[in-house]
Amino acid sequence: MLISITGGEEEYRALEQEIGSFLERIDAFQAADSKASNAVLSVFGGERKRVSEAFSTPAEIQYVAIAGKFDNVKEVNNGALQVVRHLLNYDYLWNQVRVKGGAYGVGCRFNREREGYFTSYRDPNLSATLEVYRHAAEYLEQYDAKEREVTKTIIGTISGIDTPLTPYMKGKRSLSAYLTNVTEEMMQKQRDQVLNCDIEDIRQTADVVREVIRDGVICVIGNEKKIAEEEKLFESIEPLQ
């Protein structure tokens, strides 16, 4: 068992006084209680598979996502990826999916586990949005901007990293770093990579984005008719209950 606490010495001492009785209650948990608990839980079963799937609804809007891994990319600049995430979210994806496409929102993300995703919500489109995702790597390869624009993107990225944190947020970040084996040195390295990012670093991340799309599977929640029109994209289509 791992217990995380955020607080001062007084809170820590209070936890120490209570943890013993808490563990005793766990030890006293009877089989009958276990069965009663399981009765109200849906038990996951079956083999997990990578499939592109859609869930149909009567709504006229879609939620369009594609997610994949980029294990095959040898060298990854995690700081540059954070800059690219900001750039895609507030430039390419914003303009193509939100402004031109009419979606309420859109975004992408990449993590240290070499996973990435693109997603839109309240989106009137389906295949057009997927096509935008597929051309994101091309956008990065051809990216060109004045130094001032690159600096603005870096500032926007670093502001999300260096934002003031509440005690709750500090505790959450600390626990997440502990569970994922992220050290202070790793976080500082990523911060330095963000600050030192240039146009060439941005262009080189195209390999990561291209691999996410190549490896990716699609998941869509949306209009039944639109999904039926694009049924070849999916290995599974089910009504959303």
Where are these regions (language model features)?
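His/Glu-based metal-binding/catalytic segments typifying zinc-dependent metallopeptidases
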Residues: 4, 9, 16-20, 24-98, ...
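Nucleic-acid-interacting cores, centered on viral/eukaryotic replication and modification enzymes
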Residues: 11-13, 150, 196, 210-215, ...
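M16 family metallopeptidases and their MPP-like homologs
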Residues: 1-7, 62-84, 92-199, 205, ...
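Short amphipathic alpha-helices in soluble, non-transmembrane regions
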Residues: 16-23, 131-136, 233-234
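Glycine-rich, charged/polar anion/phosphate-binding loops
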Residues: 48-53, 104-105, 203
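C-terminal structured interaction module
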Residues: 30, 223-241
